[in-house]
Design a protein with these regions (language model features):
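N-terminal subdomain of nucleotide-sugar transferases
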Residues: 2-73, 112-114, 136-139
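Short catalytic/ligand-binding loop motif for oxyanion handling, primarily in non-cytosolic enzymes
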Residues: 26, 59-62, 127-130, 148-158
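Short aromatic-enriched loop/helix-cap "lid" or pocket-rim segments at secondary-structure transitions
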Residues: 31, 62-66, 93-95, 133, ...
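Charged, low-complexity surface patches
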Residues: 32, 100, 125
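A conserved catalytic-core segment of Leloir-type glycosyltransferases
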Residues: 52-114, 118
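Short N-terminal targeting/anchoring amphipathic segment
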Residues: 109-128, 139-145
Length: 183
């Protein structure tokens, strides 16, 4: 027997996407931050609910700025969570050295525990390194915008003068005036 009642259409909730990145405009240097912003806007236009999580401490530590610029306007469907602390250099250094979000771990965990369908990591070098990947419970993706997972200086350019074809990371980090990563 056929049910005479029409079946209501299924209501499909929008896909909830978290984008986790170190840099995001206006606290960025170009490439990866701009890409993540464009990607967030494209996802929102496609009907997704997007939340961007980034850490302004990294930008402050790398630029020497103590004041964070005001946020840029975002379209409907994009929410930006800017993390910062009273010790931006210390926070960035602890993250870089340990490969985990030492100062901002609780804040990142609380944000990622908000029921996302997808968590998409981008340049996470100074927002939590590989340790941030353990946070949140969703489908997880990582886009490698640079080589920091295999090169502490991000560029595979040994001693800032030649193609890297063998590991000499401690000496190379010193050439780049960066502390070597402990992990």
């Amino acid at each position: 027997m056929v049910n005479p009642q029409p079946v209501p259409p299924l209501r499909v909730a929008p896909l909830r996407v978290a984008l986790v990145t170190t840099f995001y405009p206006p606290c960025n240097f170009g490439g990866d931050g701009r890409y993540v912003r464009s990607f967030a806007h494209a996802l929102a236009r496609a009907g997704c609910e997007v939340e961007v999580i980034y850490d302004a401490d990294a930008w402050c530590a790398m630029t020497g700025h103590s004041e964070i610029p005001p946020p840029l306007p975002e379209p409907p469907g994009v929410t930006v969570h800017r993390l910062s602390s009273r010790w931006p250099t210390g926070s960035a250094m602890l993250t870089q050295q340990t490969g985990t979000p030492v100062v901002q771990k609780a804040a990142i965990k609380a944000l990622l525990d908000r029921g996302f369908d997808v968590i998409h990591y981008h340049n996470t070098s100074l927002i939590g390194g590989p340790g941030v990947w353990a946070l949140g419970d969703a489908v997880k993706l990582h886009t490698a915008h640079e080589h920091w997972l295999v090169c502490a200086n991000h560029v595979l350019w040994r001693y800032n003068r030649e193609l890297c074809d063998a590991r000499d990371c401690f000496k190379c980090s010193m050439t780049f005036h960066r502390p070597p990563q402990l992990w």
